[in-house]
Design a protein with these regions (language model features):
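Sec-dependent N-terminal signal peptides
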Residues: 4-14
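A domain-start/cap signature at the N-terminus of enzymes
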Residues: 17-56, 63-71, 88-97, 158-163, ...
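Structural cue for short, hydrophobic secondary-structure segments
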Residues: 56-61, 100, 234-235
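Active-site machinery of serine-nucleophile hydrolases
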Residues: 62-142, 275-278
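Conserved acidic catalytic loop of the alpha/beta-hydrolase fold
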Residues: 135-155
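Short glycine-enriched nucleophile-adjacent loop
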Residues: 167-178
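The feature captures the conserved acid-bearing segment of alpha/beta-hydrolase catalytic domains
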Residues: 183-282
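C-terminal catalytic histidine-bearing segment of alpha/beta-hydrolase fold enzymes
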Residues: 270-316
Length: 316
């Protein structure tokens, strides 16, 4: 198992910008508070201090490997400030603040797919990317404190969103920390979800395919009740052909063999149908949708459906 040690320093404590229909702040890393990388906090102009709000959290997805940290920071800032992106769109529509972490995805250690929270990422020890899932929770706690100091009333649980690699991150994160997530929104998922089972057809499913070695990887037992009850909106475009299962950074050869032979070699409809069926069989409180004539994108139609889903579930 490769280990990655990243030395990252910054003299920026808070950097604000207010020309994007809101205010974005780059919050410096704070290892004493539990996170080794900075994050962006976006407060849309629609956010009101006289009502209770949720913190939207969307993991960053650079889309490529790089050992230049500024590449990841630039892409994370775009996620935070561009309303084409899912998290920013929802922040404006709901009037909720948005957190985007700046986790690296290294080129030298390219098999550690941090932005998808893969097995390699979860097994890191003794370096700056150890347990980035816990670092993300620490960032959220830090952001909530800042927002409270500004006069906002913040709900305890987060709204977790993601698309493509960050959608996979969101799905896996929700399986690990279901009690921290009020609602999970995830799409562009390669037709593959973490399945809430130890095995299928006598084939063991370890993380991130299933939950067989969940305690070994996460340090906690899988909370089946909390995961089952957490509202989730999980979607694929019918024309989506972006299949991470083909690549060595997303899955190793053993994982790929299981995916192809047990879950489905064809991303759609076979693999996605199997994932959907497993979630329905387990009784997950999820809306699982396939959108016709849509590829690998969170289209306007999808965004509107997500907005309706969030409004229905966050008022309960």
């Amino acid at each position: 198992m490769k280990k990655l040690i990243i030395i990252f320093t910054t003299t920026i404590l808070l950097q604000g910008c207010s020309n994007i229909n809101g205010e974005v702040t780059l919050v410096s890393e704070n290892s004493n508070s539990g996170f080794n990388f900075p994050y962006f906090l976006f407060i849309p102009e629609e956010a009101k201090q006289n009502k209770s709000v949720f913190l939207i959290v969307e993991p960053n997805n650079t889309g490529f490997t790089s050992d230049d940290f500024t590449d990841h920071q630039d892409q994370a800032e775009n996620l935070a400030t561009n309303d084409h992106n899912l998290g920013n769109f929802l922040a404006h529509e709901l009037g909720y603040p948005l957190l985007i972490p700046v986790f690296p995805r290294g080129k030298e250690n390219w098999k550690i797919y941090t932005h998808a929270l893969d097995r390699d990422a979860m097994r890191q020890k003794g370096n700056s990317i150890e347990r980035i899932d816990l670092q993300l929770l620490a960032m959220a706690d830090n952001a909530k404190k800042k927002l409270v100091s500004m006069g906002f009333s913040i709900e305890e649980k987060i709204v977790l969103t993601g698309f493509s690699a960050s959608g996979t991150f969101a799905n896996r994160f929700t399986s690990i920390h279901p009690n921290e997530v009020s609602v999970c929104i995830a799409g562009g998922l390669n037709g593959l979800l973490i399945l809430p089972t130890n095995s299928i057809n006598n084939t063991t499913l370890n993380y991130p395919l299933g939950i067989n070695d969940f305690f070994e990887i996460t340090g906690n037992d899988f909370d089946s009740v909390a995961f089952r009850n957490t509202p989730q909106f999980l979607f694929m475009g019918e024309l989506d052909d972006n299949d991470a299962a083909k690549y060595g950074d997303a899955y190793d050869d053993d994982e790929r063999e299981i995916i192809y032979n047990i879950i489905g070699k064809s991303m759609q409809p076979d693999r996605w149908t199997k994932s959907v069926d497993e979630y329905k069989k387990f009784g997950v409180n999820a809306e699982l949708k396939t959108y016709r004539n849509i590829g690998h994108e969170p289209s306007e139609v999808i965004k509107k459906d997500i907005l309706t889903f969030l409004r229905d579930n966050l008022k309960k």
